[in-house]
């Protein structure tokens, strides 16, 4: 029984970490920020829909 407790204490002690938790900073989706601006033709309703629309 003593050996089981010793092994348990060592196993749980090995799981201890001093690393900080991950944290997010900044915008949620920062990809291509400032590189693409929609043109008036991009905002037209004729461009909306998938390849199956109107089939």
Curated annotation (Swiss-Prot):
Family annotation (InterPro entries): VirB7
Residue numbers with lipid attached (N-palmitoyl cysteine): 15
Main location: membrane
Gene Ontology CC annotation, any one: cell outer membrane
Swiss-Prot/TrEMBL keywords: Cell outer membrane, Crown gall tumor, Disulfide bond, Lipoprotein, Membrane, Palmitate, Plasmid, Signal, Virulence
Source organism superkingdom: Bacteria
Membrane topology classification: Lipid-anchor
Lipid moiety-binding region (S-diacylglycerol cysteine): 15
PROSITE patterns, per the entry: PROKAR_LIPOPROTEIN
Any Gene Ontology biological process: protein secretion by the type IV secretion system
Location in the cell: Cell outer membrane
Signal sequence, start to end: 1-14
One Pfam family, short name: VirB7
Alphabetical list of NCBIfam families matching this protein: PRK13859.1 (NF010433)
Function in brief: Is essential for the biogenesis of the T-pilus, which is required for virulence and T-DNA transfer to plant cells. When is associated with virB9, might function as a nucleation center for recruitment of VirB proteins during assembly of the T-DNA transfer machine.
Self-association and partners: Homodimer and heterodimer of virB7 and virB9; disulfide-linked.
Name this polypeptide is given: Outer membrane lipoprotein virB7
Species for this entry: Agrobacterium fabrum (strain C58 / ATCC 33970)
